[in-house]
A protein has these predicted regions:
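An active-site-proximal structural segment forming one wall of the substrate-binding cleft
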Residues: 150-186, 207-234, 240-241, 258, ...
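Substrate-binding cleft and catalytic face of glycoside hydrolase catalytic domains
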Residues: 95-99, 114-155, 182-206, 214-225, ...
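N-terminal carbohydrate-binding/catalytic regions of secreted carbohydrate-active enzymes
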Residues: 64-173, 504, 509-511, 532
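C-terminal motif of bacterial Sec signal peptides marking the signal peptidase cleavage site
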Residues: 19-22
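Aromatic-lined carbohydrate-recognition surfaces of secreted/lumenal glycan-active proteins
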Residues: 187, 296-339, 367, 419-435
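Substrate-binding cleft of secreted/luminal carbohydrate-active enzymes
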Residues: 58, 62-77, 353-565
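Bacterial signal peptide processing site
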Residues: 24-27
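Active-site groove signature of glycoside hydrolases
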Residues: 170-206, 234, 251, 262-282, ...
Length: 565
């Protein structure tokens, strides 16, 4: 999820685990979201590619991603303020103005173009393709239960248009610039929230007018419009009139030729909102489009279809939390026997809604654990300790072993409906803070007081000795004694928890990178929307670490690239 500290402390003090989650069982088998003769007529897609996309590349990953375990980071797509010579395989950001799907609004697309440009610049400087990943919310449940995103028809149409336009833009603009067609990360926290809060009955009762919305979106995406003197169709501060005709894609290209990406995006959103939507609202329904069931399953299928149709070479992933059961994310601290019971509940939820077994399938599943460092010591007023005690964020080696075993079991458990041996896995928003030593000094703007174990687990850090007796003193002081929900680590300090299993955090081998590949992980994207370290520091988004993570990845690319299986 995109982190917000006030939201974190308020919500997770209640749920007692990582913010969102997933299932307590899905009940009986559900329709896969395609309308049948018992619901509404089935039609053949008019412009869609084959319903079964090729989801496997020549490697064990997916198309246009490397044949080794890829690495990525959060970015704002700003070449003026972020490094552009750091080797990286992928960058990600949240689409729209507010990063939450902009409910009820046409999203401004300027971030899409900024990310494509950022990836292009890094590719030019490093010589390697960079995959721009865009997070797209169609239903934002990170902040709690609401149904307006799917039951308010205006919201529904705008969300689906935003997704279709994102897919189309990546399809047509990304490849020449970046060497890939990009990736869409769909609906963080949605499925996890449903399972965590046991909302399946509420979800199953929803009547979502999917077909009318898809028909209107098809009109908005394909019709030609006369934008001359159209209401709301102006650009720049002085409201210059838009003087062009064509599709919405022609509109944004015309605007980009007149002004900067940000101003063009604002003008595009206003024009589509004020004019294009109204032109298509009165159009008769297009019955030549695929027909979907008017429920949650049909809504899922409609999103997959729109990406397949408008971005046939764009990769698509659906998200799952590790807190997808009523107990939240604390299960990960209960030892290896806690994995399979959790997995079984998640698989029940995913199968109930045919997320990976419908006619239109995503390309991969992506997991996060929570968008904050294990101990966010940089937060004021002891908020870092509140976070680590409320959010189950402090991980030792057994916790990461459990995490990878979870991904492997879910990936393989979805195989039958997916039609392949497993569903490829992305690890997303993994915090890049490391276990700091006493030799590392906290300096404002250079190195923040953040602690995390993920990079040390996967890559190791030769600066750490086997007993961790050189761990920075402020880590144990800041974390305090871990509470009873920490299971095997309950009552321990941070360093005691980290050394509980005698794991060598100073290793320099690829054993855990291989374990990730064995769990069908094709990429790890580092950093998050707030309170997490990333590959590089972004003011207000990610913390500085004196170049530790960037140097670690440089060594990985030079000496240790992990092949996929």
């Amino acid at each position: 999820m995109r982190s917000n500290y006030k939201q974190i402390t308020k919500t997770l003090a209640i749920t007692g685990g990582l913010f969102l989650s997933a299932c307590n069982g899905g009940g009986s088998a559900a329709n896969n979201g395609q309308a049948t003769s018992g619901t509404s007529p089935t039609a053949t897609p008019t412009t869609v590619v084959s319903t079964q996309r090729n989801t496997a590349s020549t490697s064990a990953g997916i198309n246009e991603w490397p044949n080794y375990l890829a690495m990525g980071t959060i970015s704002q797509g700003l070449t003026s303020s972020e490094p552009t010579s750091q080797k990286i395989d992928a960058i990600f950001t949240y689409n729209g103005a507010n990063g939450n799907g902009d409910p009820g609004l046409i999203e401004t697309p300027y971030k899409i173009y900024n990310m494509i440009n950022m990836a292009k610049t890094i590719k030019q400087n490093t010589g390697y393709s960079v995959n721009p990943n865009i997070v797209e919310y169609q239903w934002q449940l990170s902040g709690g239960w609401n149904t307006e995103d799917v039951l308010n028809q205006d919201y529904l149409v705008k969300h689906l248009f935003n997704l279709a336009f994102l897919a189309s833009t990546l399809q047509t603009d990304a490849y020449a610039a970046t060497g890939t067609h990009g990736t869409i990360l769909l609906n963080p926290d949605l499925l996890g929230f449903i399972g965590n809060t046991q909302r399946e009955a509420d979800i199953d009762a929803l009547n979502i007018q999917v077909n009318g919305a898809v028909s209107q979106v098809s009109c908005m995406m394909t019709e030609s419009f006369n934008f001359n003197n159209a209401p709301g169709c102006t650009y720049n501060w002085d409201k210059q009139p838009i003087t062009t005709t064509g599709t919405v894609k022609d509109l944004i290209n015309w605007l980009k030729g007149k002004t900067d990406n940000y101003s063009a995006g604002q003008a595009f959103s206003n024009c589509v909102e004020s004019y294009v939507i109204k032109q298509c609202a009165s159009k008769a329904a297009n019955n030549q489009l695929p027909q979907f069931t008017s429920n949650f399953n049909g809504w899922i299928q409609a999103q997959n279809y729109l990406v397949h149709n408008y971005g046939p070479q764009v990769n698509l992933g659906w998200h799952m939390n590790i807190s997808a059961t009523p107990g939240g994310g604390w299960w990960v601290h209960e030892g290896k026997n806690a994995v399979t019971p959790y997995v079984n509940q998640v698989l029940s939820l995913l199968n109930h809604y045919s997320v990976f077994s419908g006619t239109y399938k995503p390309d991969f599943i992506y997991f996060d654990r929570y968008g904050a460092d294990d101990y966010a010591g940089s937060l004021a007023d002891n908020a870092g300790q509140t976070l680590v005690q409320n959010q189950a964020t402090l991980y030792n080696d057994q916790d990461w072993d459990n995490f990878l075993q979870m991904t492997k079991q879910i990936s393989e458990g979805l195989a039958s409906g997916f039609g392949k041996a497993y569903v490829p896995v992305m690890l997303w928003q993994i915090p890049a803070a490391h276990i700091q030593t006493n030799a590392e000094k906290i300096e404002s703007g250079i190195n923040a007081g953040e602690e995390g174990s993920a990079p040390d687990y996967f890559f190791g850090d030769p600066a750490l000795n086997s007993s961790l007796n050189n761990i920075a003193d402020w880590i144990n002081l800041g974390v305090g004694t871990l509470n009873s929900k920490y299971g095997l680590c309950a009552g321990l300090t941070a360093s005691q928890c980290l050394t509980l299993n005698n794991f060598n955090w100073g290793h320099s081998d690829n054993a855990k990178l291989q374990a990730a590949a064995d769990a069908h992980v094709f990429s790890i994207l580092w950093g998050a929307g707030g309170f997490a370290t990333a590959v590089w520091a972004i003011p207000g988004v990610s913390f500085p670490d004196n170049g530790w993570m960037a140097n670690t990845l440089n060594n990985y690319y030079t000496n240790r690239k992990q092949p996929l299986n």
